From Swiss-Prot:
GO terms for biological process: negative regulation of transcription by RNA polymerase II; nervous system development; regulation of cytokine production; regulation of immune system process. Residues 206-224 have a biased composition (Acidic residues). Its main location: nucleus. Residues 339-360 have a biased composition (Pro residues). Residues 33-96 form the BTB domain. This is Zinc finger and BTB domain-containing protein 45. One of its GO terms (cellular component) is nucleoplasm. Belongs to the krueppel C2H2-type zinc-finger protein family. Pfam families: BTB, zf-C2H2. Residues 159-241, 294-403 are annotated as: Disordered. Residues 159-168, 378-397 have a biased composition (Low complexity). InterPro entries: BTB/POZ_dom (IPR000210), SKP1/BTB/POZ_sf (IPR011333), Znf_C2H2_sf (IPR036236), Znf_C2H2_type (IPR013087), ZnFinger_BTB_dom_contain (IPR050457). Disulfide bonds: none annotated.
Length: 511
């Protein structure tokens, strides 16, 4: 029997690092890059295998087959470029002022290692600012015996003035900015530590121990009455011997704070709020957010804007892409110029055009414009501003008006369809897919696109219960259930729809 052959193990410690460096060199040289990352107006080329291995965001996009990935424009392009370089090198240089931007970009790309590191950087930067200011060193009195400490606590609790429950709680007094932001501070919590600077020099060497205690204990003590009992441990009140609690209670009685908002906060809370900016500067008193009323109704006390003219007005005299200040245009916020010389508008009687009653036309949106009724005769003065491409005025007894697109010469009998079609030519795509970040000019296009991600068959046939992903497919299917048929007069072939018959008749040779 032959002896067992020797097995040699080859292990290169820096092989993975050198491989990434080689890939990074290929990326910088533009070799073998198979994916493009776009951020705002900038773009960069990279290898899809590296991006998918380092970022779940890129992996999800690449699994959908995208060769061009758009990063949401919430962070600067340079920050995303740094994170892509981090995937190749494993090193990242973060300045103190840029930590929040890098954290935001890493959260979008879902790079967990960078998220953890930036979170620690921000936490270390805010740790000195959130703690209470260091008091001046004072002589520390000798610790009291447990019996003396209990006697002192009973004396302080009995001498606490009525109407100020919880004023002797030193742990709550250290958290005015964290606990009192939504509402004005109470006398006990706001004036406790900063009532008298000369009395706040008591030693407070616990550091962050009180800050690290859970808020559940504080909430529980608030519900029970706010004061400590006899069974609590002595270390909870290390400042009793220095008279800190009595001074805090007296200062709370002498100077009750006025509910002046952010001006009552002091120490670290004031520094934190001053650095973040006053809330009054950001949101004035008259500000009411649009999401307070889900139904879109204006809340009481909110100033309302003057309603704009509800009629469909298309202006073609302005240059393309120019938006004028003031209230938004009723139909769509863009202006298209005709490719050729503008057609002269038909003559119209002088004077302002009569506006329809407000109850007939609601406030219009780009996708919800009212359609022209076939039996309705518009006012003669509204004809010059109805369409920029020389739409003919309608006279009684004539054919329904047609709206012709000045770009592709496509005609429409409905003003609603014409408006939606003109919005496509504007180049604006305000509707964006939340999965692949593709943008669409109309909401209908976005809804049709979302079926590719969800696969939901929301349209069902009422006759045979067959389901379809698109409404157009359902409409085509419903033709098979119609009892009437359109026969061909030449060959006798039967069709379910007249459009199919007309197409078939066009194929017949002329007699």
């Amino acid at each position: 029997m032959a002896a067992a052959e020797a097995v040699h193990h080859i292990h290169l410690q820096n092989f993975s690092r050198s491989l990434l460096e080689t890939l990074n060199g290929q990326r910088l040289g533009g070799h073998f890059c198979d994916v493009t990352v776009r951020i705002r107006e900038a773009s960069l080329r990279a290898h899809r295998c590296v991006l998918a291995a380092g970022s779940p965001f890129f992996q999800d996009k690449l699994l959908l087959g995208h060769s061009e990935i758009r990063v949401p424009p919430v962070v600067p392009a340079q920050t995303v470029r740094q994170l892509v370089e981090f995937l190749y090198s494993g090193s990242l240089v973060v300045a103190q002022g840029e930590a929040l931007q890098v954290l935001t970009a890493a959260s979008v790309l879902r790079i967990q290692t960078v998220i953890d590191e930036c979170t620690q950087i921000i936490a270390r930067a805010r740790a000195p600012g959130t703690s209470a200011p260091t008091p001046l060193p004072t002589p520390v009195p000798p610790p009291l015996a447990p019996a003396q400490l209990r006697h002192r606590l009973r004396h302080l609790l009995a001498a606490r003035p009525p109407g100020h429950p919880g004023a002797a709680h030193s742990r709550k007094q250290r958290q005015p900015a964290r606990l009192q932001l939504p509402a004005p501070p109470t006398p006990a919590k706001a004036e406790g530590p900063d009532a008298d600077p000369s009395l706040s020099a008591a030693p407070d060497d616990r550091g962050d121990e009180d800050d690290e205690e859970s808020d559940d204990e504080t909430d529980g003590e608030d519900g029970e009455g706010g004061g400590p009992g006899e069974g609590q441990a002595p270390p909870s009140f290390p400042d009793c011997a220095a008279g800190f609690l009595t001074a805090a209670a007296d200062s709370a009685c002498e100077e009750p704070p006025a509910p002046t908002g952010l001006a009552d906060y002091s120490g670290a809370g004031r520094d934190f709020l001053r650095g973040a900016g006053s809330a009054e500067d950001v949101f004035p008193d008259s500000y009411v957010s649009t999401w307070h009323d889900e139904d879109g109704a204006v809340p009481e006390g909110c100033p309302t804007e003057t309603p704009v003219q509800p009629d469909c007005i298309l202006s073609g005299s302005r240059p393309p892409g120019v938006k004028t200040p003031g209230p938004p245009v009723a139909l769509f916020p863009f202006h298209l110029g005709a490719p050729g010389p503008p057609a002269p508008p038909p003559s119209a009687p002088s004077g302002p055009a009569p506006a329809p009653p407000p109850a007939f036309y609601p406030t219009l949106q780009p996708e919800a414009a009212p359609s022209t009724q076939l039996g309705e005769v518009p006012a003669p003065s509204a004809a010059p501003t109805t369409a920029p491409s020389g739409t003919p005025a309608r006279t009684p007894g004539a054919e329904p008006p047609t709206y012709e697109c000045s770009h592709c010469r496509k005609t429409f009998s409905s003003r609603k369809n014409y408006t939606k079609h003109m919005f496509i030519h504007s180049g604006e795509k305000p509707h964006q897919c939340a999965v692949c970040w593709r943008s669409f000019s109309l909401r209908d296009y976005l809804l049709k696109h979302m079926v590719t991600h969800t696969g939901v068959r929301a349209f069902q046939c009422a006759v045979c219960a067959k389901r379809f992903t698109q409404k157009s497919s359902l409409n085509v299917h419903m033709r098979t259930h119609r009892p009437e048929r359109a026969p061909c007069p030449a060959c006798g072939k039967v069709f379910s729809h007249r459009a199919l018959l007309e197409r078939h008749l066009a194929a017949h040779p002329a007699p």
